[in-house]
Each structure stands twice: as C-alpha cells, then as structure tokens.
Amino acid sequence: MQTMEGRQYNYQDSINASSSMVVPHSPWHSPVPYLFGGLAAMLALICVALLILACSYWRLSGSAERDLEAGDDAKPDNDTNKTKHTEMPEKFLVIMAGDVRPTYLATPATRSEQSCTCGDHNEEEGRRG
C-alpha cells in the first residue's frame, strides 16, 4: 500500500477495479466506418449515374432506328431507312444587343439574285454617264 497525498492507495485494487469495469469499445467511435461508408455511397452514386446514362443512350439509339412520328411502329429495313432522309431547313435566331436588354429579334431576309445589285458595276456606270 502506498500513501498519496494523505490517502492510502492500493495498486492491486485499482487494477482489479479497472479490469472489472471494461466498457465495450464501439466501432462507431472510429472514423474508419464513416470513411468506408462515404466511399461506398459515392461509388453507388457513380454507378447509378452511369446506369442512367447507359439506359438513355440505349433508348435514344433505339428510337433513331424507327420513325415514330411517321407512324412506323415496326423496325424498317436498312435499305428503306437510308433513302428516307429529309433535310430540314436551317433556322437561325439572332438577338440584336442593346444597352440594357435586347432591342429586338432579327428576322432573316431571303436573298434573291434579282434584288441584290451590290456587285453590279454596269448599272452604276449607266447611272453616272
């Protein structure tokens, strides 16, 4: 027995008391489960995103083979699919910028060779002379 600061201290009693009060150590007090749980959640999120991308690509490639708007529900032959391409006219949208907000939307003007006399020098010489 030892005396510490006026008190008696029995070293063997403290060892026996501490060994009898063993508190079970929970694995959730460590950061390791949270680390692996976060990594697993990120990996699952990436897998779900890749699965969605693959399904949307598969669905888009399947719809390109048949034309639903034309009423062709069955898959067409490869020969007829190649000859049915129709060209759509190109559409342009020009926004004329202003100081605060756009001033107006530009409308495309059709050019015809008869109305354009920009490069015709014969008419200019005829007017002058």
UniProtKB/Swiss-Prot annotation:
Region forming the signal peptide: none
Chain residue ranges for the region called Disordered: 66-89, 106-129
Keyword Transmembrane: yes
Classification via InterPro entries: GDU
Distribution of this protein across tissues and organs: Expressed in the vascular tissues.
Membrane topology note: Single-pass membrane protein
Extracellular domain ranges by topology: 1-34
Protein name as catalogued: Protein GLUTAMINE DUMPER 2
Naturally occurring in which organism (per UniProt): Arabidopsis thaliana
Phylogenetic classification of the source organism: Eukaryota, Viridiplantae, Streptophyta, Embryophyta, Tracheophyta
Name of the encoding gene: GDU2
